């Protein structure tokens, strides 16, 4: 319908241009129409006359008058009128207004989903938290956003793969293995106090107990046989000057030497597998499923990192300085060059990033979306620079930054830290407010905006809680349809379509207009990678429905035509609420 109106205005514009001797090649601006905020003004409005008044050398109202009389007849349009300085207000016919109900009935859960002739193959990588501990509430926001965005892109007709990048190769995983082994020797009765700076949480003890269950005490060696002496506490100066980190690296090296490669890998792999299982289960209970779990270690084992660096070198963008190998990222606009291989010959995290994104391109994706924490703000320039150095199109890579969420309970901020063990996990949050409420609140704001997550609000059963307010609207629809069945009224949405033009109340027209808007919201939100727009829409539709319900329009009316029409409207509102909630991965409640 919107396209039909735009085409009609376009035809009128060309006709008026020819009448005035205007070169139609000057008519190069898009014809925009927007929904009227005030229904008294009509259904749609266009500023086309204001945009082209100078080209036609006419006053906007004069041009608008000529355009209105030149628009071809359209069944969907009841009339057009000029308003204000030259806006064209458009009123739809009653038949076209209520036709959306036929569309909702025909498509049901597919209403708001599209077949896209320009569909792209898209890879969305998100969460990708180090498997060094349980997911915390900060990771939860990235999970909710990434999964909702994936669902939104699928609704827009794209082929989407979800991917989790496993950081299973590097120092942080070695620190986890060290932490687990330290707890293991404690479990075996020969350990000493756990030093600061390694992982402290109870989950480390769980892995250590599993290690003891599997190996007994055969791998337990006193700490003084493999770890250098350390102070009971680290001073801030020792932390700042790197003494603590050097001690940790020394302890890791000593443990590897003491256990040998095979036994150390066994400790490492046990810690990795248990943490990955925990993360995978946590995410699945949160409604997030990945198509692929991509291992960083697999790139090293398959020599993918060295091969990618070789290609960058062959392109002339690597050089040696101070014993290290550097990438000339400044040649592509980055603020400084980046180390890809340290003095000790080890590759850096950035080298893995280069290899990983090179592999993504080789898999044939049209677009790759990386969803990262806001602390990765400097990441985009260096990765895009590496892609350009490899002769690849850096514009295919989109990086979305997500601010971490901060939890509040009783007005007080809650803290979280993985190493110290004093963190609020995603599992804690799910058990506290439920997965659906958590996802709703996570996606409610733009991802780049700071999010204060009010636990008290998320748990409240009041209209101030947007999650409850939207779910209650769906439950009210279900309640009304159930009541109709209980009272013996026969209702079928397909059969009730013939009654749809009985929906003449202003509140009914407003609700139908909201249903019309839903596909437009899905398209706009998809283009902008903005699932929060779906929640804005949900709140607006819920508000319209609650108002309609509260003003007292009797759905189970004595008049059969009115009753069936209103039940049809109720059914359609329920369906669209359900569809929109599905975009953000939230179950629609039938009872509150």
From Swiss-Prot:
The keyword Aminoacyl-tRNA synthetase applies. Gene3D superfamilies: Arginyl tRNA synthetase N-terminal domain, HUPs, Isoleucyl-tRNA Synthetase, Domain 1. GO terms for biological process: arginyl-tRNA aminoacylation. SMART domains: Arg_tRNA_synt_N, DALR_1. SUPFAM superfamilies: Anticodon-binding domain of a subclass of class I aminoacyl-tRNA synthetases, Arginyl-tRNA synthetase (ArgRS), N-terminal 'additional' domain, Nucleotidylyl transferase. It comes from the Bacteria. A motif ('HIGH' region) lies at residues 129-139. Its main location: cytoplasm. GO terms for molecular function: arginine-tRNA ligase activity; ATP binding. Keywords: Aminoacyl-tRNA synthetase, ATP-binding, Cytoplasm, Ligase, Nucleotide-binding, Protein biosynthesis. Coiled coil: none annotated. Its EC number is 6.1.1.19. It is found in: Cytoplasm. The keyword Membrane does not apply. Monomer. HAMAP family: Arg_tRNA_synth (MF_00123). Belongs to the class-I aminoacyl-tRNA synthetase family. This is Arginine--tRNA ligase. It comes from Dichelobacter nodosus (strain VCS1703A). The gene is argS.
